[in-house]
A protein has these predicted regions:
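C-terminal cap/substrate-recognition subdomain and adjoining C-terminal extension
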Residues: 2-111
Length: 111
């Protein structure tokens, strides 16, 4: 079996909702700041955009196998921590295909 873990730079309320939809057991995301009255102040406390490598490293210490799927080039820093890395290239982004190919990624999904 496997465990779905969502690691996304989107803000936590959105990530939690997506996590529920895909059956994620754990969700790691950027976090909004809230006041003591639980009102969002519009700022981000922790931003995962371009900063997922530390979380991936922690997951690699306790996981038998890590498969990473992304369409974000800044996630290339996580390649070395994964057993399998799958890049997704959105329609109209041919340069992204070359980017992933140059990084040695063999599994590239073009939409």
């Amino acid at each position: 079996g496997f465990e779905v873990i969502l690691l996304s730079a989107t803000v936590d309320p959105v990530a939690e909702s997506i996590g529920e939809c895909v059956g994620a057991k754990r969700v790691y995301s950027s976090e909004l700041n809230f006041s003591s009255k639980n009102i969002c102040d519009g700022t981000i406390g922790r931003d995962l955009l371009g900063n997922k490598k530390d979380t991936m490293y922690e997951l690699s210490l306790v996981s038998n196998e890590l498969v990473f799927v992304t369409d974000n080039k800044s996630d290339s820093s996580c390649i070395e921590l994964c057993d399998e890395f799958i890049a997704v290239v959105p329609s109209g982004r041919k340069k992204n295909y070359e980017f992933w190919k140059d990084k040695g990624i063999r599994r590239i999904i073009c939409l």
